[in-house]
Amino acid sequence: MNELLLNLVDPLHQWFLGLGDGGVVLWSVLKILLIAVPVIVAVAFYVVWERKLIGWMHVRHGPMYVGMGIFQAFADVFKLLFKEIVQPTSSHKAMFVIAPLLTLAPAFAAWSVVPFDAKLVLSNANVGLLYLLAMTSLGVYGIILAGWASNSKYAFLGAMRSAAQVVSYEIAMGFALVGVMIASGSVNLSQIVFAQAGNSGFFDWFLIPLFPLFIVYWVSGVAETNRAPFDVVEGESEIVAGHMVEYSGGAFALFFLAEYANMILVSFLISIFFLGGWLSPIQGWVNADVSPWIDWLWKGGWPWLLMKVFFFASAYIWFRASFPRYRYDQIMRLGWKVFIPLTIVWIAVTALMVFYGVIQKGV
């Protein structure tokens, strides 16, 4: 299936290169659109799925029966786009406008190094993991800027909460990925997936030897995206909407889009780092040469990656529907007193497992 896609993309790439410098620019613009458009479409359907899943959990009639809930998310988009963007008179006008863009840009830029299959990646960077750490850390600057530029005590309090929370859990996420780097011997995302390949199927994935780091990265990813039960940044019962309290219309929609794009991104990264990315859970168990439309079931391919992503993306919604919000001090305590010490200990354990051959790098 991967070869079929490449047969379509390669001739198109060569045609653009044949146009000279202008073709190179057009190809770069096309690659940007290849990131932005699918992410925006994925966010739209993710919102529909969130409404339907929570509707099933809460037995709500709207998302379950009225048009199957499909039109509610799109109605929200049109409502926000046609609303007026009102700026507070005491706000910093330029920074107020820049803040949502500064939040959205890193959320989209991070996708450029995410591999969907062995050869299906926009930029196969050798430092892809470090690039991702940098991009996922930049989004908080837009939140801080929004809180400061709004000149509102609620917005500023939400921004300060976000800064402390992201810094705390960014350290835990970084340490968790150090374990992945030690186990794989690479910071290239495709090579990290290949390091989990073998003839034992899912037993070769990093999920088993790095299970504590998997849990830390997963929970930290939820906290990093400010989602329930770590959504104190925009705690409705305390600070109304946090850093977004003064935003409306399209500007508010940009924050919304960045949040959901980051949720999908974290779901992809968990699948790549710990669940073998596009690898099949029965890799090496079946050897049969049949149609490329079927052999991905045991040889691996992007459908496996999408199924893993779907599970983690749905887990985000499940967390929101099931767990109450943590207090701010509980979130800080969990990050600094539990996750960071645990990751430091397991980095040492991972190094020993690699040294003694317990973790074997794949093909």
Curated annotation (Swiss-Prot):
One of its GO terms (molecular function) is oxidoreductase activity, acting on NAD(P)H, quinone or similar compound as acceptor. Its EC number is 7.1.1.-. It is a multi-pass membrane protein. Its main location: membrane. It is found in: Cell inner membrane. GO terms for cellular component: plasma membrane. InterPro entries: NADH_UbQ_OxRdtase_su1/FPO, NADH_UbQ_OxRdtase_su1_CS. It is an enzyme of class 7 (translocase). It catalyses: a quinone + NADH + 5 H(+)(in) = a quinol + NAD(+) + 4 H(+)(out). Keywords: Cell inner membrane, Cell membrane, Membrane, NAD, Quinone, Translocase, Transmembrane, Transmembrane helix, Ubiquinone. The chain crosses the membrane at residues 29-49, 62-82, 96-116, 127-147, 163-183, 202-222, 238-257, 264-286, 299-319, 339-359. GO terms for biological process: aerobic respiration. NDH-1 shuttles electrons from NADH, via FMN and iron-sulfur (Fe-S) centers, to quinones in the respiratory chain. The immediate electron acceptor for the enzyme in this species is believed to be ubiquinone. Couples the redox reaction to proton translocation (for every two electrons transferred, four hydrogen ions are translocated across the cytoplasmic membrane), and thus conserves the redox energy in a proton gradient. This subunit may bind ubiquinone. NDH-1 is composed of 14 different subunits. Subunits NuoA, H, J, K, L, M, N constitute the membrane sector of the complex. Belongs to the complex I subunit 1 family. This is NADH-quinone oxidoreductase subunit H. It comes from Xanthomonas euvesicatoria pv. vesicatoria (strain 85-10) (Xanthomonas campestris pv. vesicatoria). The lineage of its organism: Bacteria, Pseudomonadati, Pseudomonadota, Gammaproteobacteria, Lysobacterales.
